[in-house]
């Protein structure tokens, strides 16, 4: 059902984009808008992962410096039937994580130092499994495309506002001035709503598949509870500077709230935990992943 809903929302996003393009230049405007979107998506397809990792100051983890963490991620990737992603560390005390990359063969998982300090090895495994689920589902690519579409819609709407929309042969706007202005203001708003709805839908799906990958839904449920509580108290300075990337994290890094809202980047954490607990009660426990040895610190 999640995939059907995502497909419908993507169709709405595309229709909004073409509609704004048509408003600016009629049929030709819609075609030009489509070409612009293709160009923007092609650029982000190849560059978005490097850009977002740089925004958050992430640096690649040396397997020799963190063998336990590296082996855990590799074991989970093997269980998921996917290549081992690159592993990155973000120097912030807020516990959090995200995945990025255009496909499973070119993907990365970034975890914060705060995550490694605050969570147990089992909880870290649950978080990593969630991020691997995003990669396997190609959510990382999907969210890049939706973010690009939303940004392009806002750009086109601003262009239409300053330069005017298309007119008919008599020089009149078919929708009328009020209708044209309404579309220019409402289209970016609607695009943002659709983008966030897709993001929330994919989080639930990644929770479910991530729990299957690690074999213990309660590991992820426990991790979400801890991250939610700490994210409200600990700042993530780089995330605050780059709020457009908030939807990528496992929990909203911008002092996440506990309510489902139209513009919420994530579902209500309590609802996610409840779904995972229900999953744990109804499913047999899978075999354990390779055990992470007890650590004296985040890298030992």
Swiss-Prot record:
Using the record, list the residue span of the signal peptide; answer none if the entry has no such feature.
Answer: none
Query: For this protein, what is any one GO molecular function term?
Result: metalloendopeptidase activity
The transmembrane residues are: 7-24, 29-46, 145-165, 174-194
Cofactors demanded by this protein: Zn(2+)
Cofactor binding remark? Binds 1 zinc ion per subunit.
Q: Which Gene3D superfamilies does the record cross-reference, listed alphabetically?
A: Metalloproteases ('zincins'), catalytic domain (3.30.2010.10)
Q: Which residues form the active site?
A: 131
UniProt topology in membrane: Multi-pass membrane protein
Compartments reported by the entry: Cell inner membrane
Can you supply a Gene Ontology BP term from the record? proteolysis
| Keywords per UniProt | Cell inner membrane, Cell membrane, Hydrolase, Membrane, Metal-binding, Metalloprotease, Protease, Transmembrane, Transmembrane helix, Zinc
Q: What is one GO cellular-component annotation here? A: plasma membrane
Residues where Zn(2+) binds: 130, 134, 203
The principal location of this protein is membrane
UniProt-listed InterPro entries: HtpX_protease (IPR050083), Pept_M48_protease_HtpX (IPR022919), Peptidase_M48 (IPR001915)
Q: What's its EC?
A: 3.4.24.-
Which HAMAP family does the UniProt entry name for this protein?
A: Pept_M48_protease_HtpX (MF_00188)
Homology family:
Belongs to the peptidase M48B family.
Q: Spell out the protein name for this chain.
A: Protease HtpX homolog
Q: Which organism is it from?
A: Cereibacter sphaeroides (strain ATCC 17023 / DSM 158 / JCM 6121 / CCUG 31486 / LMG 2827 / NBRC 12203 / NCIMB 8253 / ATH 2.4.1.) (Rhodobacter sphaeroides)
Question: What gene is it encoded by?
Answer: htpX
């Amino acid at each position: 059902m999640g995939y059907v809903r995502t497909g419908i929302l993507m169709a709405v996003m595309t229709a909004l984009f073409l509609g704004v393009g048509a408003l600016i230049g009629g049929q030709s405007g819609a075609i030009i808008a489509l070409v612009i979107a293709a160009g923007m998506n092609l650029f982000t397809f190849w560059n978005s992962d490097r850009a977002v990792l740089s925004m958050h100051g992430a640096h690649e983890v040396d397997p020799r410096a963190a063998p336990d963490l590296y082996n855990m991620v590799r074991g989970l990737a093997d269980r998921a039937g996917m290549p081992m992603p690159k592993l990155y560390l973000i120097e912030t005390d807020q516990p959090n994580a995200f995945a990025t990359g255009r496909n499973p063969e070119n993907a990365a998982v970034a975890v914060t130092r705060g995550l490694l300090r605050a969570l147990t090895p089992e909880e870290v495994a649950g978080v990593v499994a969630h991020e691997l689920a995003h990669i396997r589902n190609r959510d990382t690519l999907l969210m890049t495309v939706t973010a690009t579409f939303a940004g392009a819609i806002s750009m086109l709407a601003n262009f239409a506002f300053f330069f005017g929309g298309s007119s008919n042969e008599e020089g009149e706007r078919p929708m009328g001035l009020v209708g044209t202005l309404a579309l220019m203001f409402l289209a970016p708003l609607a695009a943002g709503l659709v983008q966030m709805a897709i993001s929330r839908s994919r989080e639930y799906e990644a929770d479910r598949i991530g729990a299957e990958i690690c074999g213990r839904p309660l590991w992820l449920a426990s991790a979400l509870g801890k991250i939610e509580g700490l994210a409200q108290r600990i700042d993530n300075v780089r995330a605050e500077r780059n709020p457009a990337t908030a939807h990528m994290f496992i929990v909203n890094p911008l002092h996440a709230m506990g309510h489902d809202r139209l513009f919420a980047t994530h579902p209500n954490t309590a609802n996610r935990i409840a779904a995972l607990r229900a999953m744990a009660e109804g499913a047999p426990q899978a075999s354990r992943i390779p055990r992470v040895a007890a650590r004296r610190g985040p890298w030992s």
